[in-house]
Structure formats: C-alpha cells, structure tokens
Amino acid sequence: MDAQSTKDQGPEGADAGTLSFTYHIGDMFEDAPENCLLIHACNSQGHWGAGIAKAFKQKYPKAYTAHNKFCAKEHSKTQPVPTGSAQLLAPVDSGSQHWIGCLFTSAKYGKAKDKPDAIVKNTTASMSMLLELVRMADGEVSEIRMCKINSGKFGVPWEKTEEALKSIILQEGWREKIEIWEP
C-alpha cells in the first residue's frame, strides 16, 4: 500500500525558523531511503520493550545493543542518561542504512514513566540536541522520519508534543523538515 501524505496544517504566518512537518499514513520503516534518520522517543534506561521501540529493536538489533550499552553500561544507576538529551546512532545493522534517533523524553517506562508535562518539556530539549547532532553529522542524513512520538506508551496526546516541537527555534544548520508517520 502506498503511503499517503498531507502538508502541515500549522498556523498561518508561522515563523520560518521552526520545524515543518508533513504527515504520512503508512509504515515509516518501509521504503525509508538510505541514510534516512528514524526517530522515536524512549526511556533513559535503554529498554526498547514495547510500542514502536520494540519494532526498532526487532528491525535494528545492533543499534539496540549499542543503545542499551550506552544507557545501561556507560551510565550508572546513580548517573543515568539525562532526560531531555538525545542519541544519534549511525547505521550499524546489515541490510539497513538507517540512522536511529533516540529522544530521551522519560527517565523510566511503564507505570513509572514521567508525567506528561515533564515528557513534553523533555521533548523540546531532546529534539534540539538531536538536531544539533544531525548538523554535526555533516550531511550524512538524507531525510528525517518520525512517528507521533510520546503518543503511544508514554500516553501524551500528540497535539501537546506537536505544539512543543513547533516551539523550537531552529539554529543555523539544523534541519527544518520532518516527516511524521502513523500506521
């Protein structure tokens, strides 16, 4: 099935220095071009066990191993990965040339996940950091795709996350266009 897309329905006269979204229906992994960045929100414990994170773990097992090592081995329980930060994983899985972007929007998962307002606040800082990491990758990333982050297992209405993301003021060299995918 071909993915369907619609243009951003943001407010008229929106600042040119903010993120621009196009919306797509379909599988964000399917037919993703080489060097595409695929973004999801995750906890800072390195656990990809449910929701779209589980799909990332199944499709990109070597990326998951690197992510888990970063969270669980390179950071101690007393010095965990800070929420509001991000990780950019270069392509490591054979047969896949996709970058993985991890937005650390909640410290924990399940019933212990952060409150929605904290997750939304962490999202702006996480995305800002990820956009800077992409800039530092110096043109290696072809395009950016993202699910409706936080709206699944973290239970945050997409509209709140979307508003927070659109409040980010882009810095020089940051990507502006992001494709938003939903099944």
Curated annotation (Swiss-Prot):
A Pfam family of this chain: Macro
Keywords: Hydrolase, Protein phosphatase
UniProt GO MF annotations: ADP-ribosyl-[dinitrogen reductase] hydrolase activity; phosphoprotein phosphatase activity
GO biological process: DNA damage response; purine nucleoside metabolic process
Sequence positions that bind substrate: 26-28, 41-43, 48-53, 149-155
Keyword Hydrolase (UniProt): yes
A Gene Ontology term for the protein's cellular component: nucleoplasm
UniProt cross-references to CDD domains, sorted A to Z: Macro_Poa1p-like
Domain Macro: 8-183
Enzyme Commission identifier(s): 3.1.3.84
Function per UniProt: Highly specific phosphatase involved in the metabolism of ADP-ribose 1''-phosphate (Appr1p) which is produced as a consequence of tRNA splicing.
Family assignment from sequence similarity: Belongs to the POA1 family.
Protein name per its UniProtKB record: ADP-ribose 1''-phosphate phosphatase
Organism, scientific name: Phaeosphaeria nodorum (strain SN15 / ATCC MYA-4574 / FGSC 10173)
